[in-house]
């Protein structure tokens, strides 16, 4: 799936309500999640209730990014769907691509991604805290 969003993509069938959350999102911002379903199957909505995903491309609007991330976790774990993408949609129609930002999910290794706070040894090779207690070193140095 490309990093652009097709707003004419079909939505999953959902007979419930979002509890008014999307009404407020129309004046602020809303989030869209897209994915490709392998077959028609029911899934749990982050707002409560169930919906039926369509076979092929799906587009679902939610009020919060966390709801999209929760649905993405469910799609990845339960349905083995890993091509979901999350977008922010502003009221003026502008769309911003959010997740995964560099095309690789955060828990996966990416050759171009710089490691932050990583140590080049296993946890068993950490210094004993008592050996650095009264020195100027910290246990994480």
Swiss-Prot record:
Q: Which InterPro entries match?
A: PsaD, PsaD_sf
- Gene3D superfamilies found in the cross-reference section: Photosystem I PsaD, reaction center subunit II
- KW Thylakoid (keyword) present: yes
GO CC terms of this entry: chloroplast thylakoid membrane; photosystem I reaction center
This protein's membrane topology, according to the annotation, is: Peripheral membrane protein
**The keyword Thylakoid appears for this protein:** yes
Q: Name one GO biological process term.
A: photosynthesis
Arranged from A to Z, the UniProt key words for this protein are: Chloroplast, Membrane, Photosynthesis, Photosystem I, Plastid, Thylakoid
**Localization of this protein:** Plastid, Chloroplast thylakoid membrane
Write out the function statement from the record.
PsaD can form complexes with ferredoxin and ferredoxin-oxidoreductase in photosystem I (PS I) reaction center.
The family annotation for this protein states: Belongs to the PsaD family.
Q: What is this protein called?
A: Photosystem I reaction center subunit II
Organism of derivation = Porphyra purpurea (Red seaweed)
Q: What is the lineage of its organism?
A: Eukaryota, Rhodophyta, Bangiophyceae, Bangiales, Bangiaceae
């Amino acid at each position: 799936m490309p990093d652009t969003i097709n707003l004419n993509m079909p939505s999953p069938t959902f007979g419930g309500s979002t509890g008014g959350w999307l009404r407020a999102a129309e004046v602020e911002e809303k989030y869209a999640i897209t994915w490709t379903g392998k077959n028609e199957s029911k899934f749990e909505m982050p707002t409560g209730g169930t919906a039926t995903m369509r076979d092929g491309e799906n587009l679902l609007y939610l009020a919060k990014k966390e709801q999209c991330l929760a649905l993405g976790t469910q799609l990845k774990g339960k349905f083995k769907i890993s091509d979901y993408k999350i977008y922010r949609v502003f009221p003026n129609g502008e769309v911003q691509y959010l997740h995964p930002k560099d095309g690789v999910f955060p828990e996966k290794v990416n050759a171009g991604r710089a490691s932050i706070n990583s140590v080049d040894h296993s946890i068993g090779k950490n210094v004993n805290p008592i050996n650095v207690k009264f020195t100027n070193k910290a246990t994480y140095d």
